[in-house]
């Protein structure tokens, strides 16, 4: 569940309770950490008919459960492949954008997503470079306006833990940077 993108997916909780025979409690999972860097930004643009996505993710060592002290060989290094990560990063967005049928999540059929996932010498904060093709190509100004106006359920409810501006676009050419922008 990404609350700003697919809050309706909590409907599967009732099916889960029936399947497990429980009246209280449930298991809810968040999406893969790498797709959280780009799926929310693409979600409000789906109305333009996203055809293809090429995403290159630059994943911090925290995603591997490591620190620089426990993984010194990552310093001054890039690991060009993270086992299993590309497959997850190509399938999970379709699940996030999917619909609920008979208490189950049915993945979206499109877009076609291709990823390359790299581990980089950054302590915390994943980054993604994303290239998108659309059926109806929006202008840069249209995209920026959609991102500026986008509000998910947490923002509409003014939840205290929700960021006021869910999607933030940096005007600077050299941003975002994990060290400067992760918090």
Identify the function of each model-found stretch.
Residues 62-183:
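Charged docking surfaces used in two-component/phosphorelay signaling
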């Amino acid at each position: 569940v990404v609350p700003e993108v697919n809050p309706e997916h909590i409907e599967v909780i009732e099916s889960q309770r029936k399947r497990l025979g429980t009246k209280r409690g449930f298991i809810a999972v968040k999406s893969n950490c790498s797709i959280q860097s780009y799926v929310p930004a693409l979600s409000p643009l789906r109305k333009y008919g996203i055809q293809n996505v090429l995403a290159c993710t630059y994943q911090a060592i925290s995603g591997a459960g490591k620190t620089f002290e426990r993984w010194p060989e990552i310093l001054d290094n890039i690991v060009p492949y993270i086992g299993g990560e590309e497959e997850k990063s190509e399938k999970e967005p379709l699940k996030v954008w999917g619909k609920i049928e008979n208490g189950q999540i049915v993945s979206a059929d499109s877009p076609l997503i291709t990823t390359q996932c790299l581990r980089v010498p950054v302590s915390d904060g994943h980054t993604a470079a994303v290239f998108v093709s659309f059926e109806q190509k929006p202008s840069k100004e249209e995209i920026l306006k959609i991102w500026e106006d986008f509000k998910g359920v947490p923002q509409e409810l003014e939840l205290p833990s929700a960021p006021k501006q869910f999607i933030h676009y940096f005007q600077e050419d050299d941003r975002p940077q994990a060290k400067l922008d992760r918090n």
